[in-house]
Regions:
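Alpha-helical transmembrane segments of integral membrane proteins
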Residues: 41-45, 132, 136-169, 185, ...
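Hydrophobic alpha-helical transmembrane segments of membrane transport/permease proteins
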Residues: 57-107, 200-220
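Alpha-helical membrane-inserting segments
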Residues: 59, 63, 67, 153, ...
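Transmembrane alpha-helical segments of polytopic membrane transport and secretion proteins
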Residues: 2-5, 9-53, 165-168, 342-355
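An internal, D/E-rich "acidic patch" concept
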Residues: 38-39, 99-155
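Hydrophobic alpha-helical membrane-insertion segments
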Residues: 58-62, 179-191, 283-288
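Membrane-water interface segments at transmembrane-helix boundaries in multipass membrane proteins
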Residues: 125, 174-238
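Hydrophobic alpha-helical segments of integral membrane proteins
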Residues: 50, 88, 92, 96-118, ...
Length: 355
């Protein structure tokens, strides 16, 4: 009985038991109607968010096209070298479509992207999509490792900090988390490399490890994963602490205590489940930020990945690869934020009630 009342209170449902003049069938019909209306609201919200995400990607495509065409330097001269003749350059421009008006180039760019064609490498002639697909898994694995350990530790620290509010432990955790937020990831990367790889020599410094050797690859993930995820430990811990303190003041928590449930069970089974829901949204944004933050880790630790690919191609003025890699990264950021937003709306009854 206590558990069902707590769940009803937590979901903020209207209890139909004991209502004068109401029958069981009327109550059931009302519940079904409420659920159907909630599903329609969820679908409408999803379509709205999906349309907004598509619009963001479209704007990002336009900005990316303009920026890459404003960057100084001639990609044709870079691709063909200093000994290329004028006729060779003109032929190359015609083959790549660079000699066309800008608006036609933009139309072709959008059309090709919609067909899954991100262009060709100006040096090798390889498909940009194939190049990005070879580098992207390295970055995805790095981001997953970073987000995994930072979310786990951040939730634990935030929970302990909220339960021990205003204690010495709470203050120590507060100092640690604020310090983790304040230190830039590239500084953490440099010091981690200096301490653990150069001075102590307990972890490998550069590369992604031997192909096929899982243990060696995991060792090469430790330092960049630590550097990339340290700041997010602080963000997640502070968010979980604030959310836990808010949830601990809710009516269903008071009801659970009134029914005599153990405090540890209340925290682990009821409070924490709702308190970590906002973390889902933060992780969605965090994945996108980590995709861009991976650039520093991949450069410092000489790891293959999408960030290092963009960095190298910018130096080489290889604009098609830069366009394709940045566009894929932007799409991943938008999609991760969309998924996190929808999961958050599904898990939290308070969000669904406000749709």
């Amino acid at each position: 009985m206590a558990r069902s009342c707590i769940k009803e209170n937590r979901a903020r449902n209207v209890c139909t038991i004991g209502l004068g003049g109401g029958s069981g069938r009327e109550g059931t019909a009302r519940i079904i109607a409420d659920q159907s209306g909630g599903n329609l609201k969820m679908w409408a919200y999803f379509l709205k968010r999906l349309g907004l995400s598509i619009a963001i990607i479209a704007v990002a495509m336009s900005i990316l096209f303009v920026i890459t065409h404003m960057i100084p330097g001639d990609p044709v001269s870079i691709a063909l070298g200093p000994r290329a003749t004028t006729s060779m350059k003109e032929e190359y421009r015609a083959r790549m479509g660079i000699d066309l008006p800008v608006y036609i180039q933009y139309g072709r760019f959008v059309s090709n992207v919609l067909q899954g064609n991100l262009g060709q490498d100006v040096f090798s002639g390889l498909s940009v999509l194939d190049i990005v697909k070879r580098q992207l898994p390295h970055t995805v694995v790095l981001v997953c490792v970073a987000i995994g350990w930072s979310a786990t530790l951040g939730i634990i620290l935030g929970c302990f900090s909220a339960v021990r509010r205003n204690s010495i432990l709470d203050r120590i955790i507060g100092v640690i988390t604020v310090g983790a937020i304040a230190i830039p990831s590239f500084v953490v990367s440099l010091y981690a490399l200096l301490i653990f790889a150069v001075t102590l020599r307990v972890l490998p410094a550069l590369g992604a490890g031997e192909s096929g050797d899982i243990i060696d690859q995991l060792k090469h993930l430790v330092l960049p994963g630590f550097a990339l995820g340290l700041g997010w430990v602080g963000y997640i811990a502070r968010l979980v602490r604030a959310s836990m303190l808010e949830v601990m003041g809710e009516n269903f928590i008071r009801a659970a205590r009134a029914y005599g449930l153990p405090e540890r069970k209340i925290i682990a089974r009821y409070a924490l489940k709702i308190a970590i829901v906002p973390t889902v949204t933060l992780l969605g944004v965090g994945i996108g930020n980590m995709l861009s933050g991976a650039l520093f880790a991949e450069i410092v630790f000489a790891r293959p990945g999408i960030g290092k690919l963009i960095y190298d191609m910018v130096l080489m003025r290889n604009y098609p690869v830069v366009q394709g890699a940045v566009l894929v990264t932007t799409a991943l950021f938008v999609v991760s934020a969309l998924i996190a937003d929808m999961v958050n709306s599904y898990l939290d009854p308070r969000v669904r009630a406000n749709l």
